[in-house]
Regions:
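Conserved NTP phosphate-binding and transfer environment spanning the P-loop NTPase/kinase superfamily
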Residues: 2-69, 329-558
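Long, basic/Gly/Ser/Thr-rich N-terminal segments
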Residues: 2-203
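A structural signal for short, well-ordered beta-strand segments and their strand-loop junctions
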Residues: 118-125, 249, 280-281, 367-369, ...
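Extreme N-terminal, non-catalytic leader segments
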Residues: 168-245
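Secondary-structure transition/capping motifs at alpha-helix termini
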Residues: 217, 235, 268-279, 437-442
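Glycine-rich phosphate-binding P-loop
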Residues: 236-271
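Conserved, well-ordered active-site substructure
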Residues: 247-249, 291-308, 458-478
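Conserved nucleotide-sensing/catalytic segment adjacent to the nucleotide-binding pocket
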Residues: 273-347
Length: 558
């Protein structure tokens, strides 16, 4: 299904916001030159700060997009981080009339400034499945060509899927317009300014925004997570065949294990021999609640490379790099990961590194919230749906260097509802969506990806990744039976008999009843859950008081 251009979408053009009208006018200016991905590559090579490595672009991708046969991976290196910060966001529809008028004027002024520069634009399709395709246009300056080039790499250039897109039924939603202007100057204190003025202007109702909001507007659940589908029908041992096809999804910020759980080839050798696996995506997808299916937005991965040394096999899938060191090795310019130059080095990688991948997959059997909360056992199952969604809506985690935050913020526990820092709409809409996921039969779990209280919040019992991967397999294969976690009604932990059969020593090691300094542990447990309750009480869930009450009451610690 395809989005609509403005003349199609607005039966009354007066319903269009001034923000979209300004964006549309710029987009349709004859002085804005349309470029394809090959032209964007050539422009990006000449951009200040961009270096060409001797690492070839993944050949299959280069061939598909008609890039030069000898195309190389470009490394776009920046100075201080001034973008990617929530403080820069201004939500047009959240402002009062006076503030809207001011912002409209400032936006017109910024676009006028922008038109003093040579401008380029490109079109892409967001969404990999014929039933979820949005057209998007990105407009920027020629001096920002690498940004546009990387955007085309991350999604699908429009011409690649033009025929399929044009043949699709129309969605009740507008095309997306994005505008970037790095040379913007403004000293108005209304806007964030750290070395340079920053404005991320969001008009979510008129699709001057990213794709997450589009999905929620048409009744889907937006997921900042990874999801894979396992087919047990191909297992060598026939006892697994009855499990059929099962999908499992993981939600967490960078560094919580989301990609490790999604992309691991065989869950550290714990999946039964002969299984078949496909991955939808390790970072972003939508759950179509009407058709009970999951759909991908992007054909590529935007990954951290801090754990990928020079000889890592993933480098062959590289398409573009950001903020990587480059060394001369055997006469060639070789990019180096492992955050050698600065933290949060990133790579755009072809989905081929996932092995078998798909554009849509089965509705999830299980959803897992990945928590950085030391008072939680390694795994809990939420049998109360309101507890399940409350834990997602008040997902507790730690900030990381993938985000533009101060150093002292990195170790603080924070709430990031459903692990989605890109949400620009009301929280209650995500809550409603995930309650619907629960009503459609999905099971919900919490994994502790930090470590479990041993003696204090600083002295923790480690939870190795292999242990968590083994637990994942146990969930998928119904190996666990459950008993109530006495501290939290509606939550369950594995029984001794079932968990010891697959992870000997687990029950005693992680038994909530045997935590050191037990009184302090209980005090901290109650405090963390009170923080969750306070967070939900202070959120826009107050617009849905009945739902808010049910979620908050589910978080009562005994």
């Amino acid at each position: 299904m395809a989005s609509k251009h403005s003349a199609e979408y607005y039966s009354n053009l007066k319903d269009m916001s001034p923000i979209r009208a300004i964006a549309e006018t710029l987009m349709n200016n004859h002085m804005v030159r349309t470029v394809n991905i090959s032209e964007a590559y050539e422009l990006a090579k000449k951009q200040a700060g961009v270096g060409m490595t001797d690492l070839p672009i993944y050949p299959e991708f280069a061939k598909l997009h008609n890039l030069p046969a000898d195309a190389k991976v470009l490394n776009d290196c920046h100075g201080n981080i001034i973008g990617r910060t929530a403080k820069a966001r201004r939500f047009y529809h959240h402002l009062n009339s006076s503030q809207k008028n001011k912002l409209e004027g400032d936006f017109r002024e910024a676009v006028w400034q922008m038109q003093q520069y040579p401008l380029i634009k490109a079109e892409a399709i967001l969404g990999m499945d014929k039933d979820l395709m949005l057209k998007a246009t990105f407009i920027t300056t020629e001096s920002d060509a690498a940004n546009l080039y990387n955007w085309l790499l991350n999604f699908t250039p429009f011409d690649q899927l033009k025929e399929q897109y044009n043949a699709s039924p129309k969605l009740p939603i507008q095309d997306i317009i994005l505008i970037a202007f790095n040379e913007w100057t403004c000293d108005d204190t209304f806007y964030n300014n750290v070395g340079a003025p920053q404005l991320a202007l969001v008009d979510e109702k008129h699709n001057v925004i990213v794709a997450w909001t589009s999905g929620i507007r048409i009744g889907m659940a937006a997921c900042h997570g990874g999801i894979k589908e396992i087919d047990f029908g191909t297992c060598e041992d026939a006892k697994y065949h009855k499990l059929g096809v099962r999908s499992i999804a993981f939600y967490g910020l960078s560094g919580t294990g989301k990609s490790s759980h999604t992309n691991n080839a065989d869950n550290a050798g714990t999946l039964p021999r002969g299984f078949s696996k496909v991955v939808l995506h390790d970072d972003a997808f939508q759950i179509d609640l009407e058709n009970k299916i999951c759909r991908a937005w992007e054909p590529t991965l935007f990954d951290k490379t801090d754990s990928r040394p020079i000889d890592h096999p993933d480098w062959k899938y590289a398409l573009a790099l950001m903020n990587h060191a480059t060394l001369e090795i055997d006469g060639k310019r070789i990019p180096v990961g492992q955050d050698l130059r600065n933290s949060n080095g990133r790579a755009l990688l072809d989905r081929g590194l996932l092995g078998e991948y798909v554009n849509h997959c089965a509705f999830p059997k299980a959803l897992v919230w990945l928590m950085k909360d030391s008072v939680l056992p390694p795994v809990i199952k939420c049998t109360d749906k309101h507890l399940a969604i409350a834990m997602g809506a008040a997902l507790m985690t730690q900030r990381n260097r993938a985000e533009n935050v101060k150093e002292e913020e990195l170790n603080k526990l924070v709430f990031e509802p459903f692990a989605n820092p890109f949400r620009v709409y009301e929280l209650y809409r995500d809550v409603d969506a995930f309650l619907a996921v629960a009503d459609n039969g999905a099971d919900f779990y919490c994994f502790n990806s930090r470590g479990y209280w041993k003696e204090s919040d600083d002295i923790l019992e480690a939870i190795p990744l292999k242990t968590s991967l083994t637990l994942q397999t146990a969930l998928l294969t119904d190996q666990l039976t459950w008993e109530p976690w006495s501290a939290l009604p509606g939550a369950m932990i594995p029984t001794r008999e079932s968990i010891e059969a697959i992870l000997p020593g687990f029950y005693d090691k992680y038994n909530p009843e045997t935590r050191g300094n037990k009184d302090n542990y209980i005090t901290m447990l109650k405090d963390r859950f009170q923080q969750r309750k306070d967070f939900l009480m202070s959120s826009d869930l107050k617009e849905k008081p009945e739902t808010q009450t049910k979620l908050v009451e589910s978080l009562n610690i005994k």
